From Swiss-Prot:
EC number: 7.1.1.8
Protein name (Swiss-Prot/TrEMBL): Ubiquinol-cytochrome c reductase iron-sulfur subunit
Annotated source species: Rickettsia bellii (strain RML369-C)
GO cellular component, one term: plasma membrane
Lineage: Bacteria, Pseudomonadati, Pseudomonadota, Alphaproteobacteria, Rickettsiales
Domain Rieske span(s) in chain numbering: 97-184
Family stated for the protein in its record: Belongs to the Rieske iron-sulfur protein family.
């Protein structure tokens, strides 16, 4: 009988150890879960504050109706606090811009790369001189494009810098044609 008693006692001890381990594991799991949920609840507002606010999102893209812009006319709209020039170029201006040799340009870029395919007459550029940030004047200068009154940079009808201290062409913002007469900038 002594063998049986020892066996029963061993089993009893094993059973007690398992229940203590089980309770301990449950408590650790519960405490860890509460800590993880607490950390997530604390970090959520912090991470969410990094998202842009509603007023910034409102300015992130604009739609522009092109139907009122006559051939040969340049219109200025405001996007993200910057002036954007939208030009409805004449066929002569397009041909003139495409005839320019790349070796003549300070910042070589093909005219076709500055416009959307199928909409070659529409040129959309950010209206800030790449030298010191002045706003160039449309249809001015020796190249009948833009002229920066601050330091004399001159851009052609494709917005490419041709003369002066500006190191780069007028930037082209991200834009898409929603229809033949409407674009979305941004």
């Amino acid at each position: 009988m002594s063998d049986t008693e020892d066996t029963n006692n061993d089993n009893k001890v094993e059973f007690e150890d398992r229940s203590k381990t089980s309770r301990r594991d449950f408590m650790v799991l519960t405490a860890s879960s509460v800590a993880a949920v607490g950390a997530a609840c604390t970090l959520w507002p912090l991470i969410n504050s990094l998202n842009p606010s509603a007023d910034v999102l409102a300015l992130s893209s604009i739609e522009v109706d092109l139907s009122n812009i006559a051939v040969g006319q340049t219109v200025t709209v405001k996007w993200q606090g910057k002036p954007v020039f939208i030009t409805n170029r004449t066929p002569d201006k397009i041909a003139e811009a495409r005839a320019v040799k790349m070796s003549e340009l300070i910042d070589p870029e093909e005219d076709q790369d500055r416009v959307k395919a199928g909409h070659d007459n529409w040129l959309v550029t950010i209206g800030i001189c790449t030298h010191l940030g002045c706003v160039p004047l449309a249809n001015q200068g020796d190249y009948d494009g833009w002229f920066c009154p601050c330091h004399g940079s001159q851009y052609d009808s494709s917005g490419r810098v041709r003369r002066g201290p500006a190191p780069l062409n007028l930037a082209v913002p991200p834009y898409t044609f929603i229809s033949d007469k409407k674009i979305r900038i941004g």
